[in-house]
């Protein structure tokens, strides 16, 4: 009684108390899971083959899933750590790709809304654990590819939060994933190394199995993280992934014309010494 509290004073007090008593629900969730002896971890090296139905001998798919899961855990415990790759589930529509990601991280910590307003987008990235780029094959232009490449590359974002007066650098707590149907979703070959593609074809994901084994999967990722396992592919697997991504790159419009030209002229032109682009264009 007798004190006058201005709006500025009230806001500053609210922010001070919030910062002093900050709370991270995902940290608490993972720490409780880690200490729960009743939960037996899944095999971190076989998550894709066990739960997505990829071939058991497909080590690349299993390894891509493994580094994604470790990256999820690491971003929680080491906010803003380097994790510039995106796990992509490719397959027919309706097989449960997005539902897999939503179940995995929990609906409250999942987002698939790519806001056009950059500030809203950066705020959303700060409040989720898994951000899905749904229907990745819809982002077909070079501009789209550049924006997504920029999003994946950053480990912190500079913006002003609500009620704050100045911009500040905010380390990221979340990682990206993606889903797609078509096979030509990579518009920029220079940035394709960031996409780890697991091709499911038309295989339906057993979502009940994911729900029942979600905690085992996440606990396996926690244990792997605690052991110091990496959230990125080794050089051999990265080369395999980059080579595999060529199957999903958009064809340059000149390539089909060049193919037709070489095919139609195969009987009347000697190609053994090669040919120049000028020759192909003129003839």
Task: Show where each model-derived region lies.
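Feature primarily recognizes SF3-like P-loop helicase cores of small DNA viruses
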Residues: 2, 8-25, 82-85, 112-114, ...
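P-loop NTPase catalytic core of nucleic-acid-dependent motor ATPases
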Residues: 18-130, 277
């Amino acid at each position: 009684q007798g004190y006058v509290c201005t709006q500025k004073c009230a806001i500053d007090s609210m922010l001070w108390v919030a910062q002093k008593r900050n709370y991270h629900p995902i940290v608490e969730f993972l720490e409780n899971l880690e200490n729960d002896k009743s939960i037996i971890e899944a095999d971190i090296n076989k998550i894709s083959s066990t739960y997505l139905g990829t071939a058991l001998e497909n080590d690349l798919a299993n390894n891509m899933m493994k580094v994604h899961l470790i990256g999820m855990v690491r971003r929680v415990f080491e906010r803003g750590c380097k994790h510039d790759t995106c796990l992509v589930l490719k397959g027919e529509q309706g097989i449960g790709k997005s539902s897999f990601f939503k179940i995995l991280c929990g609906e409250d910590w999942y987002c698939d809304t790519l806001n056009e307003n950059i500030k809203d987008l950066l705020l959303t990235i700060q409040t989720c654990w898994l951000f899905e780029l749904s229907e990745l094959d819809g982002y077909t232009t070079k501009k789209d590819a550049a924006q997504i490449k920029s999003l994946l590359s950053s480990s912190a974002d500079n913006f002003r939060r609500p009620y704050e007066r100045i911009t500040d650098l905010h380390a990221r707590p979340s990682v990206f994933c993606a889903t797609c149907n078509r096979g030509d979703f990579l518009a920029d070959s220079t940035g394709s190394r960031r996409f780890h593609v697991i091709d499911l074809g038309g295989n339906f994901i057993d979502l009940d199995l994911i729900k029942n084994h979600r905690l085992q999967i996440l606990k396996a990722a926690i244990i792997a993280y605690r052991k110091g396992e990496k959230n990125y592919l080794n050089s051999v697997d990265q080369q395999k992934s980059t080579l595999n991504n060529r199957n999903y790159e958009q064809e340059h419009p000149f390539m089909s014309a060049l193919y037709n030209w070489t095919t139609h002229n195969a009987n009347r032109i000697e190609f053994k010494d090669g040919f120049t682009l000028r020759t192909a264009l003129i003839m």
